[in-house]
Every structure is written in C-alpha cells, then in structure tokens.
Amino acid sequence: MSIQTIRLSALALAATMVAACYQVPQSTAASGQAGEIFASDQAAGSVIVVDKIGMPSTGWLVVHAVQNGEPDLSGAIGHAYVSAGPSSNLSVPLTTALPAGSEAVVMLHLDTGNAKVFEFANGAVEVLDGPVLRDGKPVMQKIALR
C-alpha cells in the first residue's frame, strides 16, 4: 500500500468522521444550494477564480493539485476564508503557480478547528478543517488551466 493510498484513506476516514458530526443543510441559497461550487476552466497562473459557491457555514475554499488525473488530497496549494451562504467571483491565491495544461480541484472545507485558521496540513493524521460533504461526497470541481 503506497503512502498516497494511506493518506487518501486517512482523509476519507476524517471526512466520514466530520460527516457524522455535521450535515450540510439542504435548503436552497439565493444563488444555489448550500454545499455547491461552480468554477470554469481558466488561464494558468498563481490565482484561481471560482464563479460561485453555496457554503453551509463559514469555512474555506481550497485548491488541491491534480496528479496523474486524480486530486492530490494530501495537502492544499491554496485556500481562502469564505462566509456562510452564497458568494461569487472568489479569488484563491496559490502557493505555487500552476502551468498551462495542468488541472486543479477546488473544494469546500469546513472551519471546525480554530476559527479562521486553516488546519488541513500536508500528511496530517487529524484533519480539523475537513471537506464539506453533500450526499456523502466532498463538494469539489476539477478545472483545467490553459
């Protein structure tokens, strides 16, 4: 079993534990349902712009890299704090610019640890700010960078 598989298994376990404690509201927000994300393919660079989200509570809009066609959920390459409810035209600064031809995943995360402190460290066993789940799956969208 590879270290990547172990990390993904740990993330899945953490997401399940978060889901057991927190249910995404099913009510419809003004610009979409809570626990939704809409992002378009965009120009490569050091910022990702997300068209709109519906966030069930305050939390994080997170960018994960894509490796070999799969999201690399072992860490984040960018994050921005977001308020509960609908938001649009959100910018997420990246720690490393992504080149043209690459892909990224934008994902909603809860703020369940220390308020306004992103606690989703690379390789962490305990994930405090885990993903928002809708129907048992992380709320995320893959985008291409051109």
Each model region followed by its residue ranges:
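Short acidic/polar inter-strand loop motif in beta-rich domains
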Residues: 109-125
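C-terminal partner/receptor-binding element of secreted or periplasmic proteins
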Residues: 120-146
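Bacterial N-terminal signal peptides that target proteins for export
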Residues: 1-10
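Bacterial signal peptide processing site
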Residues: 22-24
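Solvent-exposed serine/threonine-rich low-complexity stretches and specific carbohydrate-binding patches
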Residues: 73-85
